[in-house]
């Protein structure tokens, strides 16, 4: 028994040291990485995000009415900020703009387009609210509504209270304007 203890004790004392001196290689990653975008799009691959309860980040964009719209200047009003992949996504909102105004909500649309095109679309289709030109996708990206790989806005919307705080956020799906109106009405009416 004494001989067994003499052999086992040195083995137990040396095994932790032996395990620690063993070279360990880091696990290999199985993730494939796509080539990194370049130019302005490199900065847009890291999407921001805005959560319910956050103060909406300020921005300044040119509207379809050829004026600069600063989000922080809209404080005092409820704001529905709608992001669409292309300008055709705004046509459905013309039907609810009057109802939104009746409950004290200002509608602002954002898409990745230029101001001149948005002005032409507004005049041609009689769009009664301001569409904001996010030509580079920078603002959409800051809000988490930009797909850098496809270089387009992700559909969704935010409802901002009079202090600019996000009260409702929906991202990644096209919601019919009538349902957006209902959700916005419920949000504005909530205590």
Model-derived features with residue positions:
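Bacterial N-terminal signal peptides
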Residues: 5-15
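N-terminal "domain-start" segment that seeds a small globular fold
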Residues: 23-71
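Short active-site neighborhood of thiol/selenol oxidoreductases, capturing the structured segment around
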Residues: 69-93
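Residue-level structural signal for beta-strand termini and adjacent loop
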Residues: 72-74, 145, 172
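Structural microenvironment flanking redox-active thiols in thiol-disulfide oxidoreductases
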Residues: 87-130, 137-141
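Structural micro-motif
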Residues: 128-129, 145-158
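Thiol-/selenol-based redox modules, centered on thioredoxin-like
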Residues: 153-191
């Amino acid at each position: 028994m004494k001989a067994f203890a003499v052999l086992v004790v040195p083995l137990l004392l040396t095994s932790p040291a032996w395990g620690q001196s063993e070279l360990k290689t880091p696990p290999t990653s199985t993730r494939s990485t796509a080539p990194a975008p370049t130019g302005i799009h490199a900065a847009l691959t890291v999407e921001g995000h805005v959560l319910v309860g956050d103060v909406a980040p300020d921005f300044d964009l040119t509207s379809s009415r050829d004026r600069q719209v600063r989000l922080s200047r809209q404080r005092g009003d409820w704001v529905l900020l709608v992001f669409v992949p292309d300008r055709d996504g705004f046509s459905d909102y013309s039907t609810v703009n009057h109802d939104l105004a009746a409950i004290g909500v200002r509608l602002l649309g954002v898409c990745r387009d230029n101001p001149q095109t948005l002005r032409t679309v507004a005049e041609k289709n009689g769009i009664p609210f301001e569409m904001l030109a996010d030509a580079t996708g920078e603002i959409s990206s800051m809000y988490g509504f930009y797909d850098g790989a496809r270089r387009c806005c992700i559909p969704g919307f935010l409802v901002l209270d009079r202090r600019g705080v996000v009260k409702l956020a929906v991202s990644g799906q096209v919601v019919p304007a009538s349902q957006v109106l209902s959700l916005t009405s419920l949000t504005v009416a909530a205590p």
